[in-house]
Amino acid sequence: RLMYWQVYLHKTVLSAEKPGEGNMNFTLRIKTNLRSFILKQSRGYVEKYPQVAAPENRAMMEAAFYDIIQDSATLSAKMPKLIGKDAVNNILMLEDLGEGSDFARLYKQGDTIDANALEEIIDFAATLHNAFDAKNFDNPIRNLEMRKLNHEHMFIYPYLKENGLNLDEILPGLRAVAAPFKQNELLKSKVAAMGVLYLADGDTLLHGDYFPGSWLQTNQGIRI
């Protein structure tokens, strides 16, 4: 695989390494004698949990997202540039944003985010939500298969009495805390109604993975 890219680029590949801990896709940082870039491949399963099936072409949905946001200088400046794509093998070639840290630290008790960073993150989501209307596109991104996967894990799986997940391994005592929520039928009916909305086609463009792990603090500022 490295030899293929070396011939294709007419450059010397110096190294290939994982840029971080990802869940969904197989990702590499490729360093050459001239630059570095990111390769991301989506396969027919969740990379971190191979037993979980996932839409194989999800990287191409992501590529379509990158193409659309190029019409917004504000949004495209906050995200890596899409350099190229291989639709046959579901591979994206992306700009390398460099070494940085994400905001997953916010899940730790006592950790915070400063007001300016929070405003940037909120502004990005608000701009994205208002900048595009599906009615203006011949083929708007629907990505229904990926939404079905997320729907199962957000609106169904957590509320099953026995879902095979040992919550106490995540945090001691969490199983007992979660039990009342799993037994609350009113809550579950409200969650189910939200799930129906989630699966419905809307008119706005959404980022499908907008959470602290996708917010990066880099030398160029916050990137998504």
Regions found by a protein language model. Name each.
Residues 1-16:
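Juxta-kinase regulatory segment immediately upstream of eukaryotic protein kinase catalytic domains
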Residues 3, 73, 195-198:
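Structural motif corresponding to the C-terminal cap of alpha-helices
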Residues 8-10, 74-78, 199-200:
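Short helix-terminating capping/connector loops at secondary-structure junctions
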Residues 17-32, 38-39, 189-224:
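Active-site acidic catalytic loop and adjacent metal/ATP-binding pocket
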Residues 19, 29-140:
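ATP-binding pocket architecture of kinase catalytic cores
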Residues 141-194:
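Active-site catalytic-loop/activation-segment of kinase and kinase-like phosphoryl-transfer enzymes
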